[in-house]
Each structure stands twice: as C-alpha cells, then as structure tokens.
Amino acid sequence: MSLIKIHGHIGYDRFSEIDDASDRELFASVHAWADGLHGSAVMLDGDRVFGRLVSEHGVFSPFASVNVVGDDLRFWPHQYGHGPVPDHARRIAQSFGAGTYEILRRLRIGVVGCSGTGSVVVDQLARNCVGELVLVDPDHVEDKNLNRIVNSRKEDAQQRRLKVDLMAEAVEELGLGTLVSIYASSLASANAIRAIASCDVVFGCMDSVDGRHMLNRLATFYGLAYFDLGVKLEADGEGGVDQVCGTVHYLKPGGSSLYSRHVYSMEQVRAAGLMRTDPATYRELRREGYIKGVAEDRPAVIQLNSLIASMAVNELLARLHPFRLDPNGEYAVHTISLSHGIYDHHCDGEPCELLSRHVGRGDVRPLLDMPELSVEAAAA
C-alpha cells in the first residue's frame, strides 16, 4: 500500500520549506507503519499537479510524471522539454498543438494484439510520434493475414515471422524516433503483464473475450487508460452480408467495464480461458453441453479494421487535446454499422461492481488476483 498526501498551492509551483519539514515529520511515521513507496503532492490553482516520493530517511525524489485518467487524459511530467518540433512532426503540432506533440513523445503505449486492427493502430501511433510502444502478440504471420496486417509481405508468412517482430521492424524503419519493446506471448504472461502495467495507455486489439477481460482487469489494477477495439463482419451464408460493424470502447479505472457494458458474459470468459489453458477439457465440456463454444477465426477485412483503428487513435487524441463540441464524457462508447448506416456514441455507465474494488491495487500476489497467473509469476 502507498499513501499520498496532497494539498494545494496558489501561484507557488514548488514545495515550500514548510512542506519539507511537515513531509519529513509525517512520513517518518508513515514508513514506520507501512512498507512501500509513499509520497507528497501539490495541486496548483491552474489545475496542474506535481509530487515527490519521501523516503523513510526524509530524502525527496520527484515523481517522473503525474497522470490523471478520467474523461480527459492529463499528463504532467516533472520536466517539460519544449524543444524545436522536427519537420516530420510539424503537421501534428499544427493540428493539436506543440504541447500535445510533447505529451505524445513522452507516452509509453501498449498494444495487445498486432494483427488486423492492432497493426493499423501501431502504424498510426508511430506516425503520430509516440515515444515508446510495447507490443504483445504470440502469433506468427500466415498467408490468411496478408490482406489485413499492415506492412506484411508474402515472405513474412513463408518465414513464419512473429507479428511483433514485423511491427517492430516497420516502426524502426520509419525512423521517427519511436522506441519499441516486444513480447511474443499472450497477455497471460507475467512478463507481458508487467510490461503493459508500466505503460500510460493501452490499446486492446484482441478477439478473445478472456484476453479483453484480463486487459480490462490489468488497466483497473494499474490505473491505465484503456481503448478496446472490436469489429464484426457476419456473412449470411449465401454470398451476402448480414452485418458490418465495429466498436471502440474507452474505459477508465473505476468506471464501467466491458463486462458491465455486456460485451461478454463471465460464462464466455470461462469458456475462452478453458480453451486457451486446457483445450481437451474445453472440447469435452462443449461436447457434453456444459459450456457454449467460442467463436474462432472470425472474418475481417483491412478497410473495416482501418476504420475502427483510426477511430480509436482519434479517441486518444481527443482526450489528450479535447477538440469536440461536446464533453469527452459523452464518448465512452463509439458504435458504427456500415451495413445499417448507423453511428452512435454513449457516455459511461455505472461503476463495474466486479472491478471497481480493484482500482489502483497495483502489484498483488498472484498478479491481478488471478490464480492462473501465480504459476506464470513464479516461473518468470
């Protein structure tokens, strides 16, 4: 557990000598009662927040950044570096301001799933000059992926290249300064979870409901802004199409969740998790009618993936640099149906009863309070 003391200043953007003395006195007692990292923060009248860690010996270390994950996304780094904007970023600065460009350069963003929507998200984030990308995907490129994974080639499928390797190479070849870390595993890996937990923002580009549920849980435990992407293309079996649609969810810690928004049921999460961890038992229970089958290998096309990926990246930019006429709180869910000519958006719902009690818990044992991750953590 960590304790943060916070108070306000009017027009004084640093800690005072009185703050130094009171923090040393207070946190000497705090450290005696509770292990862990503890700190002190100041909120300015201009709405900015800064802070510092206070050691048990009264030594101060500034917070690298203070992040506020709400309807708007606010990031206040300890040091602002407003250097010259390079030529390749000038259009970004012209569109959203030099301040937004500086924030993008400092962001560490996770992308879980690097196939259809994920590959487009990675490409757009890199071209928007994000500071670092953390990519998670266990799969390799196949022929069936070539029509929807940006930057993939026939030889990548022939060589069975990992999708994360392909994405990392493409980003590095752009030469725009974005760093890339890759994890060729599912999210259900201790190393992948810790890497995503260290991000500021995460994009979920997965089909599996157990992966989406785990990522929503991770974002809750570690206080991350979470953008979830979903696409659906349903054929009618007779050469036509029943439905072409997609959704972008923005989820903030302590708000509603994918589960409470009825994106999936816990029965579906259980079935998907069982299919991943114990396929034989999954097939047996499905055959006996105890669980419903999990949809596999859904159809997808690059134009629908690109549309939904663009909506998601624009949603990030709208929350960093609010440009809409209406408040961001009215855009927790975007739904678009190309088959039915519908675009709609909704505000956040009630806090999720399942996840809200886990907000900000951070590192626990087992990771995310999920028994299946205890073995992973022990092996890591």
Model-based region annotation:
Residues 135-175:
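Glycine-rich phosphate-binding loop and adjoining beta1-alpha1-beta2 segment
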